[in-house]
């Protein structure tokens, strides 16, 4: 007998925002219901908010379309941010020298699952 799937996930790879900046936003929505998370993200004034909202929307769509889960019963069970590849650039400085510039990227993963009864 096949086991009932109760979670779905979505990932955004190589997002051009540093992981530590995205983690500030992600920490606000961990463990919340999907509706509450969308409300929090809508009013969070950070550049990472729309990106995290897009990944969350994708995870909810995956849950509804692929696994027939109800949107009202979904909570964010896991959400994490990993560092992606770093783009290394150089900025010219005085006296012919140069300083390194690291343009950091991130991978965002959101896992939504059905609320546990009880």
From Swiss-Prot:
InterPro entries registered for this protein in UniProt: Ribosomal_uL22, Ribosomal_uL22_bac/chlpt-type, Ribosomal_uL22_bac/org-type, Ribosomal_uL22_CS, Ribosomal_uL22_sf
Q: Which GO terms describe its biological process?
A: translation
Record's Gene Ontology CC terms? cytosolic large ribosomal subunit
Record bears the keyword Ribosomal protein: yes
Q: Name one GO molecular function term.
A: structural constituent of ribosome
Q: Does the keyword DNA-binding apply?
A: no
Q: Which ranges of the sequence are coiled-coil?
A: none
Q: Which UniProt keywords apply?
A: Ribonucleoprotein, Ribosomal protein, RNA-binding, rRNA-binding
- Domain of life the protein comes from: Bacteria
Q: Which family does it belong to?
A: Belongs to the universal ribosomal protein uL22 family.
| Biological role | This protein binds specifically to 23S rRNA; its binding is stimulated by other ribosomal proteins, e.g. L4, L17, and L20. It is important during the early stages of 50S assembly. It makes multiple contacts with different domains of the 23S rRNA in the assembled 50S subunit and ribosome.
Give the quaternary structure: Part of the 50S ribosomal subunit.
**Protein name according to UniProt:** Large ribosomal subunit protein uL22
Species of origin reads Pediococcus pentosaceus (strain ATCC 25745 / CCUG 21536 / LMG 10740 / 183-1w)
The top of its lineage is: Bacteria, Bacillati, Bacillota, Bacilli, Lactobacillales
Q: Gene encoding this chain?
A: rplV
